[in-house]
């Protein structure tokens, strides 16, 4: 299938080609085989409405992209959190690759504007349907992997996904206190102590400041709307410091 056959007439063709060119410039990714890029954004409804054309939908690419995404995210988490248990790694990965997270990424990159949809799917709001956008994101990852291999996929995620992990966008699924405890116990360093340093604000909107220490040495300070949340944030800060020190050794 030539890329020219993917669009009905010259006007639509050139408009769509221009969109895909702008998209590649914007994300600093340039496909060698642009057919894979177009396929990643081709919904089955579009193929069904053009049965006489040799179009391919994105479902197989989605299948591949799902596996590639899990692998690359797993590698990143494995390296970043050396003290995290298998169970917590699994929970965190699940939060990153779940539908709402992928939809958010697809929106951020304006994937919906590029999707090729059948008229029926378009009329029923398919372009904004969460499941469709999540599938397109996975298909794009699959297409990029087939086109260029694993390294460019990791580079793409390094720009658009890994910073969100570093910024704690998925920390709601993580138990930092348990991780810190495991890290400390593993090295036989003693017992952790948590202390509330400060609390302020009205009863309905309290803010707490917590300190976590080890043998009298302050490891981390955190704030939160509850004592538990403040302690979790203190543990998160302490864990980040200790892991950074650990990797330097």
Curated annotation (Swiss-Prot):
It is an enzyme of class 3 (hydrolase). GO terms for cellular component: cytoplasm. Residues 20-149 form the RNase III domain. It catalyses: Endonucleolytic cleavage to 5'-phosphomonoester. The keyword Nuclease applies. The active site is at 66, 138. One of its GO terms (molecular function) is rRNA binding. It comes from the Bacteria. SUPFAM superfamilies: dsRNA-binding domain-like, RNase III domain-like. The keyword Cytoplasm applies. Its EC number is 3.1.26.3. Mg(2+) binds at residues 62, 135, 138. It is found in: Cytoplasm. Gene3D superfamilies: 3.30.160.20, Ribonuclease III domain. GO terms for biological process: mRNA processing; regulation of gene expression; rRNA processing; tRNA processing. Its cofactor is Mg(2+). InterPro entries: dsRBD_dom, RNase_III, RNase_III_dom, RNase_III_sf. Residues 223-249 are annotated as: Disordered. Residues 175-244 form the DRBM domain. Keywords: Cytoplasm, Endonuclease, Hydrolase, Magnesium, Metal-binding, mRNA processing, Nuclease, RNA-binding, rRNA processing, rRNA-binding, tRNA processing. Digests double-stranded RNA. Involved in the processing of primary rRNA transcript to yield the immediate precursors to the large and small rRNAs (23S and 16S). Processes some mRNAs, and tRNAs when they are encoded in the rRNA operon. Processes pre-crRNA and tracrRNA of type II CRISPR loci if present in the organism. PANTHER family: RIBONUCLEASE 3, RIBONUCLEASE III. Belongs to the ribonuclease III family. Homodimer. NCBIfam families: RNaseIII (TIGR02191). This is Ribonuclease 3. The lineage of its organism: Bacteria, Bacillati, Bacillota, Bacilli, Bacillales.
């Amino acid at each position: 299938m030539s890329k020219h056959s993917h669009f009905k007439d010259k006007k639509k063709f050139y408009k769509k080609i221009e969109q895909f060119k702008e998209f590649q410039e914007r994300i600093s990714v340039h496909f060698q085989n642009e057919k894979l890029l177009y396929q990643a954004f081709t919904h089955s409804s579009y193929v069904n409405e053009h049965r006489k054309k040799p179009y391919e939908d994105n479902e197989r690419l989605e299948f591949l992209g799902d596996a590639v995404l899990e692998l690359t995210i797993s590698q990143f988490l494995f390296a970043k959190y050396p003290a995290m248990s298998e169970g917590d790694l699994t929970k965190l990965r699940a939060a990153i690759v779940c539908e709402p997270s992928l939809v958010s990424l697809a929106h951020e990159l304006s994937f919906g504007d590029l999707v090729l949809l059948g008229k029926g799917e378009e009329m029923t709001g398919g372009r904004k349907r969460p499941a469709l956008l999540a599938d397109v994101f996975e298909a794009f990852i699959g297409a990029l992997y087939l086109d260029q291999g694993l390294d460019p996929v990791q580079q793409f995620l390094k720009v658009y996904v890994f910073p969100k992990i570093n910024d704690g966008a998925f920390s709601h699924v993580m138990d930092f206190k348990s991780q810190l405890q495991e890290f400390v116990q593993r090295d036989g360093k003693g017992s952790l102590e948590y202390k509330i340093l400060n609390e302020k604000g009205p009863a309905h909107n309290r803010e707490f400041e917590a300190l976590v220490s080890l043998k009298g040495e302050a490891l981390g300070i955190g704030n939160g709307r509850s004592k538990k949340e403040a302690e979790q944030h203190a543990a998160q800060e302490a864990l980040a410091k200790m892991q950074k020190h650990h990797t330097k050794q």
